[in-house]
Amino acid sequence: MIGIDIVSIARVERCVKRFKMKFLERFLSPSEILLCRDKSSTIAGFFALKEACSKALQVGIGKELSFLDMCISKSPKNAPLITLSKEKMNYFNIQSLSASISHDAGFAIAVVVVS
């Protein structure tokens, strides 16, 4: 399955400015927050990536999958990687996840392929 999501970077900037860490902690782990380094485009990309993953799994964010069930990291070449907890990998019967994030014209877009 494939999931895709697009997020306005300006909207993320407004949320960070208004809600500070409370906004980030709602959908990012401490290690993911460190990866973002307060960069709005990266935060928007990470949000889009988690939303795209939930769409690829056809469940959205809710009872079956929370933002914190997904973990974003970077490959040695700085490409985004997304993983799920072992429990969720088994629950959804996932063998692998592939991810891509791009930024342009004030938007962050992410795609996740689940196999």
Curated annotation (Swiss-Prot):
UniProt keyword annotations, A-Z: Cytoplasm, Fatty acid biosynthesis, Fatty acid metabolism, Lipid biosynthesis, Lipid metabolism, Magnesium, Metal-binding, Transferase
Cell location: Cytoplasm
Catalyzed reactions per annotation: apo-[ACP] + CoA = holo-[ACP] + adenosine 3',5'-bisphosphate + H(+)
Keyword Nucleotide-binding: no
Membrane-spanning ranges: none
Gene Ontology annotations for the cellular component aspect, listed alphabetically: cytoplasm
Entry EC no(s): 2.7.8.7
Cofactor(s) needed by this chain: Mg(2+)
UniProt feature coiled coil, ranges: none
An MF annotation (GO) of this entry: holo-[acyl-carrier-protein] synthase activity
Residue positions binding Mg(2+): D5, E51
Entries under InterPro entries matching the protein: 4-PPantetheinyl_Trfase_dom (IPR008278), 4-PPantetheinyl_Trfase_dom_sf (IPR037143), ACPS (IPR002582), Ppantetheine-prot_Trfase_dom (IPR004568)
GO biological process: fatty acid biosynthetic process
HAMAP family in UniProt: AcpS (MF_00101)
Family: Belongs to the P-Pant transferase superfamily. AcpS family.
Function text: Transfers the 4'-phosphopantetheine moiety from coenzyme A to a Ser of acyl-carrier-protein.
Name this protein carries in UniProt: Holo-[acyl-carrier-protein] synthase
Native source species: Helicobacter acinonychis (strain Sheeba)
The organism's taxonomic lineage, starting at the top: Bacteria, Pseudomonadati, Campylobacterota, Epsilonproteobacteria, Campylobacterales
